[in-house]
Amino acid sequence: MELITIVHPNRDDYISIIFEFKDKVNKHILVYDKSDNEYAKELKKAINKLNKVYNLKSKIEILQIDEDSKSDLLNALKNIKVTQDSYLNGAGADIALFVFLSSFILQNNGKVLAYDIADNSYNIITKNGFVSKNIENLMSIDDYITLNNDTIISEANIAPMLKHKDSLELLFKNVTKLYELYRLIMKQDILKIEFDYKDLAKALIELEIIDSGYNLKVAGNFLGYLLEEYILLNVIDFDFDDIKCSAIISFDQMQVKNNNIEIKNEFDILVIKDNKMGFIECKMGVSSNAIETVYKSDSIMEYFGEYAKSIIVNLQNSKDKRFQSHLQYKDGIKFRAKTKNISIYNDYNFNKKEFEKLLINTFKVKKENKFAKQLKERTLQNLNNKFNTLGDYLWVILKSLLL
């Protein structure tokens, strides 16, 4: 199979097709206007990375054209030898260029792939008609990041977090009490902790946040870290294709330059569903400027494409004198966020049903612990690969029961 991709800045329009047919393509031809030269170079690097990850051998050719020059377009056709195994991947491209190449390829018995990012489906068009297909090979977060020529520098290990659920449920049952316990730990009011908050303190000891003497074992404000884990444990019950926690991404230089984002960004929770990326920001307390948090999320989200979405989760302290009478994300801020595909969960306590409703409406997911099952299977496989004897195998089975 020969895949001819028209390269342009909106990568989400064509990387799903590249991934869908990665195992069938033996040759990529990247066609691009001279103004998109850098994007073509980045995509070539990204496909080479993908080939390395999946041990693929596809060749890559690049073809620069001036889409405003008719003679240049006609000359370009001489470098494309169309067969019945040639497919054009041109969603989102310049219309004139797409029509020109589509006509040429169809006339020579090739095919055109028309990808619909909203439905994550595509049509295979021939000169005799078309057939509709759904994308079958869904990208993981790693795949998506690879095809954007970015790098995940680090991420948290989610598997151990699954064992923290009971402790976190107890801590977030009453957020006001959690804030008060935090204040007492900072003051080292041992008697008050022993008398009124011993069960919550025990949960923090189990999570290795404090020691048995109620001294901090972690640096900084641990409330945000706890919220991140707690939200993660609520998210994994839904049918996302992949989830990452505390992931730091190093973005490619083109995205840094064009989207005005930082070279590196840390995401509390990253998710992907049907090849569309999203993220969740977890914040405890009040920020200096809530609208700035919305604008920051929007600027980062632009990188993930127009169908990316995010949620900001903010749990406030009901005893904070600055915001006792109102929440910091007022209706005007929520409306502005909604226009940018950002949902807001802002309250004094955590209502699981309300959060799940927001999660479903934002990311179009349903409750099904697909990712949790995959995580357990991967953990078991990793364990199984380490052991060979019958005794060791039985130990693996025991481990699986404990997950």
Language model region names:
Residues 93, 97-109, 333:
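Short Gly/Thr/Asp-enriched flexible loops that form oxyanion-binding sites at enzyme active sites
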Residues 17-21, 39-53, 101-103, 322-340:
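Short, aromatic/basic amphipathic alpha-helical patches
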Residues 86-90, 105-126:
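Short, acidic/small-residue loops that bind anionic groups at enzyme active sites
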Residues 1-49:
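N-terminal beta-strand-loop-alpha-helix module at the start
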Residues 6-9, 59-73, 283-286, 347-350:
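Short beta->alpha junction loops
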Residues 5-10, 32-35, 90-92, 284, ...:
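Structural motif
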Residues 140-403:
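Intrinsically disordered, low-complexity Ser/Thr/Pro/Gly-rich regulatory segments
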